[in-house]
């Protein structure tokens, strides 16, 4: 049994064509156990309207985005394995996959890996942080059997 608990919420109008829950679990299992022995993550799949609202409210950006990460910070006296929530916008992920000439599955996997690293405290604001995070993403994606998600940018 996995040491990562997944709470998958499908909050988009059309759910056909989305990755199966087992794939989301596989992606979480590919990234989190190397950092934490136990984790619980909520992944909420949303449409552009909800992504736009959340991105505006929490990041001040007036557009939908691919993935938002909301780390859970419990008070010190509470010991919970809850890592946080990932909000992933279906339409943005599908559009980006096409633009970046990636398979949809590959880009979904990348968004889960990318979001989990944010939940773990990684960031890409500064160049050195971005380099470290992208390197980890590439390593994890390749371990999961996918290509380097930043390959096109490196060519």
Curated annotation (Swiss-Prot):
The keyword Phosphoprotein does not apply. PROSITE patterns: UPF0054. This is Endoribonuclease YbeY. Its cofactor is Zn(2+). It comes from the Bacteria. Binds 1 zinc ion. One of its GO terms (molecular function) is zinc ion binding.
